[in-house]
């Protein structure tokens, strides 16, 4: 099982009681077990306290310890690769940021100005001219309909 030197006092007592019961000690012959009341009693807070990490690792079997160490080494290798990736990714972002700067400056120049654009789209001029002509005609009709006084004052 486990080494008696590494066991705590509570563990060694429990093991001794189990061994006595298996060997047919006094309690087993009388039918009244001292282990039963001990199992019903709540454990002391010190026994319920979590073990420190070092003690926990020491309590594991060697095969599990080897796996844990191997996983730690693999995780370190993954961390190194990820750090290298992040470094190269930042360098690549910087490179393309420098390439995009002139284009972004032109976009800012075009969108940031309040003046009209010097470039025109095809067909845009025709639509603007038609809209202006329609507006002028409407204004003339409104003026003629409600005009009082003017060149045609005396209509006969």
Curated annotation (Swiss-Prot):
Location of region: Disordered: 1-58, 120-156
InterPro entries: NAP-like_sf, NAP_family
Start-end of Basic and acidic residues biased regions: 1-16
Coiled-coil features, chain-numbered ranges: 68-94
UniProt keyword terms in alphabetical order: Coiled coil, Nucleus
Biased composition (Low complexity): 34-49
Name of the featured protein: Nucleosome assembly protein 1-like 5
Subcellular compartments: Nucleus
Similarity comment: family membership: Belongs to the nucleosome assembly protein (NAP) family.
Biased composition, class Acidic residues, residue ranges: 122-143
Superkingdom of origin: Eukaryota
One GO BP annotation of this record: nucleosome assembly
Entry's Gene Ontology cellular component terms: nucleus
Lineage, top ranks: Eukaryota, Metazoa, Chordata, Craniata, Vertebrata
